[in-house]
Structure formats: C-alpha cells, structure tokens
C-alpha cells in the first residue's frame, strides 16, 4: 500500500538529490525517478494490460545509483527549463550510427515529461491552465516533423487538432497531466531520415 511505498519512494528521491552535485529542481528529481520505472514481469501478462495504468502506474523505480548511472547500452539527456506560454524547446540530433542498419533506425525510446503548471482555483475542475506535451521523431526532407512516439499505454496518439471531446484528449493524450511518459521500442526499424528532433 501507499503507507509502505511512499517512504521508500521519498528515500529514493532524497538519495538522488544527495548524490547529484549542486541543486536540481523538484521536477528534475521526479523525472529521473519516474523515467527509471519499469513494469515487473508479473504484470506483463496479457490479462493485466487493460488495467495496468490504474494498477501500477508508471511502474517501480530503480535504486538511486541505477537511476543516475544507467547502463552501458543507454544514454539519458535531461532538459530542465522554464517554458513560457506559446513557446517551446526544440533539440535536433542525428540517430546514432550504431543503431542504423540497412537504412533503418532501431532502438528503444523513452521520454518523461514533468512540469508544474499554473493553477487557478477559480476554474474549479479546469484549474490547470497549461498543457505541455512532447513530440519526438524524424525531420523529413521538406523540413516537416514526423512524430514517432505515443503516450505510454496508448496504441495510437490523438492529435490536438483531431477535434476530440475533452475527455478523449485527457484519456488518449494525458492532456493536463503534469507527468507524461512516452515510449516506443523500435524492433523492426523505422525507414527514412536519420535526423531526429525532440520538441
């Protein structure tokens, strides 16, 4: 239960904070913790998939040392910034050559977004006034962007321009959520450009 889990998670957060030189934000600490989370093998059975989000959330966090040191087959980048209204942060990079075979990009992608949105209690159920989302994918030859990730637990992302009902945007895109996780395992490869973006 939460009375047992909460102190363990708080201890891990405190250990991460202590192990990092200098000061980092609360959002960065939470992002590091959540980014490390994994789903135990017990819960990977097919019968759990439809309820996994409500039963285990983003999963169980690793210990502080594993969170900060990672492993030799992965890299984690942390972007910590204050995003002003109607602005965005964009980062371009080339897909690692060691993960390109026969013109296709391979690898596992995981993105964790943690924000502290403005809250206005005058709006009651709609008190959260900002929605921040992530797009990650290929930069096409015409300079357009092709998104290649979807929110965790979703098989097909819904665009903000699809004119969906508010509840659908909340369910499918995790709209208004201050914590969002996106993930994709590229086992069969993605053809096309090897220049990618994070936005």
Regions found by a protein language model. Name each.
Residues 42-46, 120:
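Intrinsically disordered or highly flexible coil/loop and linker segments, enriched in small
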Residues 122-178:
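Surface-exposed beta-strand/loop patches in noncatalytic accessory domains
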Residues 30-36, 48-55:
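A glycine-rich phosphate-binding loop feature that marks nucleotide/adenosyl-phosphate handling sites
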Residues 51-140:
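Secreted peptidase-domain scaffold signal
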Residues 107-109, 175-199:
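Noncatalytic modules at the cell exterior or secretory-pathway interfaces
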Residues 1-43:
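Hydrolase catalytic cores
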